[in-house]
Amino acid sequence: GPLSIDGSGGSAKLVMAGPGPAFRLVGTHGGTGDPGSRKSNVASHQRLPTIRNIEVEGAHAEADGFELVETMQSVFEGVMVTRCRHGIHLIKRNRNVLISHCHIYFNTGVGVYLNAVNLHQINIAISHISYNRLGGIRLERSEVRNLQITGNDIEYNNHKSHVAKPEPTAEIYIDTTAEGASVNEVTIASNTIQATGSPGGANIRIMEKPDSSRPPGLFAVSGNIIGSQENNVHLTGCYGVAISGNTIYSCEHRNLFIEDSRLINISGNTFRRHTPRYGTGVRFTGCSDIAFTGCSILDETAESQPDLTALLELDRCKRINITAAV
């Protein structure tokens, strides 16, 4: 029948002392989000597996928190995963996932990991996802649609707190370079996404191979506080992205770095240099059909940029409209 695990007000703790997930949720849902695609046993016995009010702590280098396989309508609420490898790991196929009010904290892998998964409809909200070495929220080798990331604190997701060698990563890392991978219909809104630089790192990184027939697109990045990384927002090979109403600050390279992308609308953002050792600036390279409207870019110091880079750069771009920028 239906499954629920409740730790009674957060008092329960499970220590995972071996490799693999502390909890593996395995269903048989092979359909979509359409009610008619569900088998009868999925609708009656597998719906709404719920994990609530429990802590998982890893005591093994390959211990994970949770792994989801072919589930339907999974819910995580009030869950903490710490000192594991991956926090919540979604593989193969899942539908209609809700993650809220969780602490995915100080893990050696990824906080919320969408890895080689076919997943439509997932909401990640009102959670702290921080100090995870290989990224806060990471998508790789996956087909994902309808991803909402809203109201979270996503920060310090790199090697520094782990005293480990750096690897390129991001607080939100979307990689669609693998064969067959695609990510569309994504909202990133009302989050704090920060806070320490790392080599090759970004706060938001979205990347695609240039020859893809389905580039990452239909993205909205709105109303976030984004700061303190090598690149704050770094897009490669994207098509159809709106970036609006964000405060984006303190970069080692660029606040906004967009490569080989089309149909990008950037409006109402504040770009600034928050601390003396960081810089500020926006760069487009190999882009077309770009609207850059109503944004401010401020260096703030009398000494100017550390490497004297321009605040706004266009390289090999066409059909760019820049209006009402300060």
Language model features: what each stretch is:
Residues 1-16, 42-53:
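Beta-solenoid repeat scaffold
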Residues 3-7, 24-29, 76-80, 102-103, ...:
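Well-ordered beta-strand segments characteristic of repetitive beta-sheet solenoids
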Residues 17-42, 59-68, 82-90, 94, ...:
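Extracellular beta-strand/beta-solenoid scaffold signature
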